[in-house]
Amino acid sequence: MRAKTTSRHHNVDEQEIAKFEAVASRWWDLEGEFKPLHRINPLRLNYILQRSGGIFEKKVLDVGCGGGILAESMAREGAQVTGLDMGYEPLQVARLHALETGVKLEYVQETVENHAQQHPQHYDVVTCMEMLEHVPDPASVVRACAQLVKPGGHVFFSTINRNTKSWLMAVVGAEYLLKMVPKGTHDAKKFIRPSELIGWVDQTPLLERHIIGLHYNPITDHFKLGRNVDVNYMVHTQRDSE
């Protein structure tokens, strides 16, 4: 039975949800629309493991988990993972895949703001990957993530910088020329400059610890992490120990 989603939060964009609902059945197709997410997942996972000091037996929340690519990989590392998303179909795909692979984790259809009200300072690690640019109020998500993590805990964000280069790479290149992701996946106006993200972080108990770029070379078809944050980037933050 389909979960009721008629009561929506102010920070949910129905059109954004619909984009991912439409392609949810292909989330675990390694050659499909989500191939880039599968390709970069090891880089993201290793960054999270290194910067957090490991997640074995830690309580981890993946905000905007979609079909569960990152969430499932963190559960395989021994973490107690909860995946959070507002898309019904992606969560159904995530649950089914977890059953098929035998990976134990929990998926919840709920906004991060509501989850934060119910579970303050509950998690050791919170991840929010490629989600901020898909909501009306990304600062609200940052505040909720800060509320959810324990003192001394870690919060990781990833998003796309807002400039001409990122528009050319993430929209023109990835969507129209290389067809790496479906057309219309991104709205360049919603991209977020690092200074904006750090500004929101600074208004919470979170402290910026590290920032790194994620680069794609179309000639070698290779992804890597590096210092340049012109396009995709990740930010590691840590909640102040109280």
Swiss-Prot record:
It catalyses: a 3-demethylubiquinol + S-adenosyl-L-methionine = a ubiquinol + S-adenosyl-L-homocysteine + H(+); a 3-(all-trans-polyprenyl)benzene-1,2-diol + S-adenosyl-L-methionine = a 2-methoxy-6-(all-trans-polyprenyl)phenol + S-adenosyl-L-homocysteine + H(+). GO terms for biological process: methylation. Keywords: Methyltransferase, S-adenosyl-L-methionine, Transferase, Ubiquinone biosynthesis. The keyword Methyltransferase applies. Its EC number is 2.1.1.222, 2.1.1.64. Pathway: Cofactor biosynthesis; ubiquinone biosynthesis. GO terms for molecular function: 2-polyprenyl-6-hydroxyphenol methylase activity; 3-demethylubiquinol 3-O-methyltransferase activity; methyltransferase activity; polyprenyldihydroxybenzoate methyltransferase activity. InterPro entries: SAM-dependent_MTases_sf, UbiG_MeTrfase. Pfam families: Methyltransf_23 (PF13489). It comes from the Bacteria. The keyword Acetylation does not apply. S-adenosyl-L-methionine binds at residues 44, 64, 85, 129. HAMAP family: UbiG. Belongs to the methyltransferase superfamily. UbiG/COQ3 family. O-methyltransferase that catalyzes the 2 O-methylation steps in the ubiquinone biosynthetic pathway. This is Ubiquinone biosynthesis O-methyltransferase. It comes from Yersinia pestis.
